[in-house]
Amino acid sequence: MSRLSRNPAFPAIAIAILTGLTAVPAQAETTKDRILSEKSVTIGIHNRVPWGYLDKDGKVAGLQPAIIRAALAPLGVTEVKFVIGEFSTMIPGLLAGRFDMTAAGVGITPARCKSVIFSEPDLTSGDGLLVASGNPLNLHSFLDVKNNPKVRLAGARGSGNAAHAIQAGVPESQMQQFQDVESMVSALVAKRVDAVVMSAATIIATMSDPNVKGIERADPFIPLKNAEGDDVAMVTAIAFRPDDTDLRDLYNEQLNKLKDSGELEKIILDTGFTKNNLPPNKTAEQLCSAPEQPK
């Protein structure tokens, strides 16, 4: 028998050696693994129509929750929990682990791409017009407004939407600036203005109010183009933590299936958007490296 085998400490040494040879470092559970195993995902919403909000029954509704449900349900993820916060807290809350992904209409911008990773685009939300029912002046673009000097256009003071109208050539003499959405809509209903410019999402939120009557969305609407010929618009997507690339990639696979089947378009139209708001033919990577767009 060897000296080592006669050593009383030998069994402990042998166990330690074998344990060291066979032990495998424990792998931390990823967000994707947890979501798939628990069949549940938690999303961040800012409780605003049409992005992500609570309906009259207290259930989460809106465009992006509907897309997330449709994307993840085939994987067995059928429970959608939510955390409500201000829009400004969406990215900080995501990074702090308060929820797994955003569903708040967060636009893809180069600045935001430095903090989070995005899914492929799910919507284009550009400018739009609210007009009197029947669109009596046949307004479908800023050019239509510009070409009719009698048209009085309302815009929110300091908004990008009003700035786009001016940039498109609408004379400032035709623009009336208001403090908020409510005052603009009241002016349109009272026929003090002929049209109101605001974002497509704000139009949907406005028209969801059953008390708003006598006005409609100008459809279609031809938006302002940038120097590259693309619509001047916010492009939205779902935001993820930078470490959750596997979750983002899985979500993108499911999102592409929704696009190919036409289900994404149906969700977009059912939410109140139009075909003008379908996602662009650009990737999140391209948008992350593009010049800044409206937020």
Q: Language-model segments: which ranges?
A:
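Acidic, polar ligand-binding/catalytic clefts
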Residues: 69, 81-145, 221, 227, ...
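Extended ligand-binding regions for polar small-molecule ligands
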Residues: 65-75, 135, 143, 151-152, ...
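Beta->alpha turn/N-cap motifs
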Residues: 44-49, 83-88, 97-109, 132, ...
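Extracytoplasmic small-molecule ligand-binding "clamshell" domains
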Residues: 28-105, 114
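A ligand-binding cleft/hinge motif common to bilobed small-molecule-binding domains
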Residues: 89, 105-114, 166-167, 194-230
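Ligand-binding clefts/hinges and TM-proximal coupling segments of bilobed small-molecule sensing domains
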Residues: 160-175, 249-295
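Bilobed "Venus flytrap"/periplasmic-binding protein-like clamshell domains
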Residues: 42, 47-50, 60-74, 128-180, ...
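Periplasmic-binding protein-like
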Residues: 124-128, 211-252, 276-294
